[in-house]
Amino acid sequence: MKSELIFLPAPAIGHLVGMVEMAKLFISRHENLSVTVLIAKFYMDTGVDNYNKSLLTNPTPRLTIVNLPETDPQNYMLKPRHAIFPSVIETQKTHVRDIISGMTQSESTQVVGLLADLLFINIMDIANEFNVPTYVYSPAGAGHLGLAFHLQTLNDKKQDVTEFRNSDTELLVPSFANPVPAEVLPSMYVDKEGGYDYLFSLFRRCRESKAIIINTFEELEPYAINSLRMDSMIPPIYPVGPILNLNGDGQNSDEAAVILGWLDDQPPSSVVFLCFGSYGSFQENQVKEIAMGLERSGHRFLWSLRPSIPKGETKLQLKYSNLKEILPVGFLDRTSCVGKVIGWAPQVAVLGHESVGGFLSHCGWNSTLESVWCGVPVATWPMYGEQQLNAFEMVKELGIAVEIEVDYKKDYFNMKNDFIVRAEEIETKIKKLMMDENNSEIRKKVKEMKEKSRAAMSENGSSYNSLAKLFEEIM
C-alpha cells in the first residue's frame, strides 16, 4: 500500500515555499510516498500567487496541490492581528476534514501523517478524529523555536513576559549560548496587544505533536538543536535543511535575465545586494538615508526597492512607478555606472552570482539560509517577526554577519517606524561588509558554512540522515 502525507502550510511565501520544497524532497527520497499540499487563500497578497501558479503549470509527480476554497475575508479581518493567520485555517476546517476523511477511506493509500505549519497546529484536532498523527513544521530556526518554548514555559509559570518589553534585561535561553537581550525578542511575544497568550497556546499544542521538523541543519545551529533534544517536554526534533527554492518563485523571467545580465558585467565579489523581503518597504526619509549611505560607500550595488502596500489595498507592490520621486535628486545619474535600483529580485539567483560579495538583509529565516547556501556574508537590518532574533544569532552566535541594526523594529501591520538609521552608519557597515580582505573572519566562516550546508543535504550528511530517521518514524 502506498503512503500519503498531507501538508498544510500557512499562506505566506516564507512558509509555503519551504513546505512545498520539503514535499518535493520527501518524494525524491521515498519512492512509495506521495504528498498532498492543501493551500489556503489569504485575503491579502502574501507573495504566493505566482509560486502557486508555477506549481500548477510545472507539476511534480506524486505531488498534488489542492487549493482550498476562498472564504469571506470578513471571517477573520476583524480578528486581533496575532490571530489572523491561525484564524484562516479555522475557516477551512470543514474542507480539511472532508479531504482527510476521503483520503483515509482509500483502499490503495494509507495516510501516514499530517504535517502542519506551526501557525496551523490546531488542525491537530481534526487529524486526531481520523487517528492521523500530526507533525509540525517550524519555518524559523532552532534558536527561535527554543526561545518560544522557553517564553511559553515562563508564561505557564505565571511570569509576565511582557515585562521584558523595552527593558535592558538579558535572558538566559537554553537554545542560545549567549544571553539574549530583551531588545531582540520578537515583539509578538512580549506585547500585551500582540496576542502572546494565544501564540504560546500554539507552542503548547506543538508539545503534543509527534515530531517537529525544522528548516535548519546541525552544523549551523548545533547548540540550539542539542538544547531542544535535551528537553524531555519537547517532541523529537528533525533538522532537515537547508530546504530552499533554488529555481525561483515564478516571477518574471525577463526581468530576472536583465538583472543577472547586469551582474555579469560586474567584477567578482564587488556588488552589495540590498533586499528586505516581500514586506520590506521604508518611509521616504529612510530610503534617502540608504541611498546616501550607498553612494558614499563607493561600492557597486543592486538594490531591491519596493513600496509598501497602499492604504486600503491588499496587493503587494513589486516596484515604484517613478524612482526619482523617492530617491535623492540626481542619485540615479550619479550612481548609474556602479549601481542598479530594481523592484522585485530573483534573490537566490542574485546571491549565487559570483559578482555579489555582500547582502544587506532583513534576516528572514529563508534569506538567512539562502545567504549561507551561497556563501555571502550579511549586514543585518531586521524589521519584524523573529528577524531581530535571527540577526542576533547571525552576529553573536554564529559570527557570519555584521550588524547595522539588530533591534530595528517595524510595525508589521502599520509599516511605520520613527527610528531612522543614518547614512553614516550604513556607509560604515557596508564598507565593513565589503572590505577586500581574504582572511576576513566573517567571510571565512560564511564560506565554511556554505560547504557545510551542502554537505548536510548530501548522502550521509546530517540533514540527509535526519530525514532518513524521520521516514522511519513516519512510515
Curated annotation (Swiss-Prot):
The protein's matches in SUPFAM superfamilies, at most eight in alphabetical order, are given as: UDP-Glycosyltransferase/glycogen phosphorylase
Cystine residue pairs = none
Q: Which residues form the active site?
A: 15, 117
Tell me one GO biological process term.
terpenoid biosynthetic process
Q: Which residues bind UDP-alpha-D-glucose?
A: 345, 347, 362, 365-367, 370, 386-387
- Entry keyword set: Glycosyltransferase, Isoprene biosynthesis, Transferase
Q: Which molecular function terms from Gene Ontology are attached? A: UDP-glucosyltransferase activity
Where does this protein act, in terms of pathway? Answer: Secondary metabolite biosynthesis; terpenoid biosynthesis
CDD domains in alphabetical order = GT1_Gtf-like
Query: Which stretches are transmembrane?
Result: none
**EC number per UniProt:** 2.4.1.363
Q: What is the effect of changing residue 144 to Y?
A: Loss of glycosylase activity toward protopanaxatriol (PPT)
Q: Say which enzyme class the record assigns.
A: transferase
Known outcome of mutating residue 82 to C: Normal ability to transfer a glucose residue to the C20-OH of protopanaxatriol (PPT) and gained ability to transfer a glucose residue to the C6-OH; thus producing both ginsenosides F1 and Rh1
Expression tissues: Mostly expressed in leaves and flowers, and, to a lower extent, in roots and stems.
Q: Where is coiled-coil annotated?
A: none
Q: Which Pfam families match?
A: UDPGT (PF00201)
Q: Does the keyword Glycosyltransferase apply?
A: yes
Question: Which residues of this UniProt protein bind an anthocyanidin?
Answer: 15, 385
**Site (Essential for the glycosylation activity toward the C20-OH of protopanaxatriol (PPT)): residue numbering on this chain:** 144
Q: Which domain of life is it from?
A: Eukaryota
Catalysed transformations (reactions): (20S)-protopanaxadiol + UDP-alpha-D-glucose = (20S)-ginsenoside C-K + UDP + H(+); (20S)-ginsenoside Rg3 + UDP-alpha-D-glucose = (20S)-ginsenoside Rd + UDP + H(+); (20S)-ginsenoside Rh2 + UDP-alpha-D-glucose = (20S)-ginsenoside F2 + UDP + H(+); (20S)-protopanaxatriol + UDP-alpha-D-glucose = (20S)-ginsenoside F1 + UDP + H(+)
Q: Which family does it belong to?
A: Belongs to the UDP-glycosyltransferase family.
Protein's job: Component of the dammarane-type triterpene saponins (e.g. ginsenosides or panaxosides) biosynthetic pathway. Glycosyltransferase that catalyzes the biosynthesis of ginsenoside F1 from protopanaxatriol (PPT). Triggers C20-OH glycosylation of ginsenoside Rg3 to produce ginsenoside Rd. Mediates the conversion of protopanaxadiol (PPD) to the ginsenoside compound K. catalyzes the production of 20S-O-beta-(D-glucosyl)-dammarenediol II form dammarenediol II (DM).
Q: State what protein this is by name.
A: UDP-glycosyltransferase 1
Q: Which species expresses this protein natively?
A: Panax ginseng
